[in-house]
Amino acid sequence: MTDAEMEKIWNNLKRNLKSYCDENGFSDVMLGLSGGLDSAIVSVLACDALGAEHVHALMMKTDYTSELSLQIAAKIAALNGFDYKVVDIQPVIDNQKRFLAGVFGEEAKNIVLENLQARERGKTLMACSNQFGYLVLACGNKSESAMGYCTLYGDTCGGISPIGNLYKSRIFELARWRNTLNEALPEAVIERAPSAELSAGQKDEDSLPPYHVLDTILAAYLDDGQTEAQIVKSGFAEKTVRWVIRQYHRMAFKREQTPKALSLS
């Protein structure tokens, strides 16, 4: 994308987020700030749209939260001047783990424990929404949503999804462009490998194709209407293309339950 195109998208997102908040009676918004790029860009967008005094963020750490994530999240809050707090949700996860072992009659599987973390974060944000009257912003992107790489009732919680119509590759571009205006995002949050940090050493690309591959396939299939055969013919591995398309259709049940994504126009 050109600088002009990115500026247009950013301004449209700002306008649409402000309009959505006004129309629904919200002056303030809240999000989970993870130290990753998606929540980082959403926090900056919210500050640009509403003013930093109307943005509130929680870093909800667990045993898998890296020191780098804590440092990055704190730096983003400092650069942009919004309300920020760190809370430790590991004790809640540990209690849930013990409770579920009793329910199951055996130890919970890793996938259960991973999703517990995301759901505890979502539950905490929604509790804050009830307590303080904030609109919760979901921080998922179009790539994750298409692949179902998200936790229902966890990171999908929220009243609106500001970047839900942006592929991950576009978010990297948009972040770099936004930093040309002023330093709103630490370079480390743009450079680091994406990770949900729900287990030790976890990386997005352990579960998904590289984003530049995934997003090109998704754009060809969803936006350009190309067939599987046409996408393969353009140079992608048949196995990868088939997996992406099948996963997209398999994960429709998740997309049906995610918040509305802001329009880019």
Label every PLM stretch briefly:
Residues 1-34, 41-265:
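ATP/NTP-dependent adenylation/nucleotidyl-transfer catalytic domains that generate, transfer
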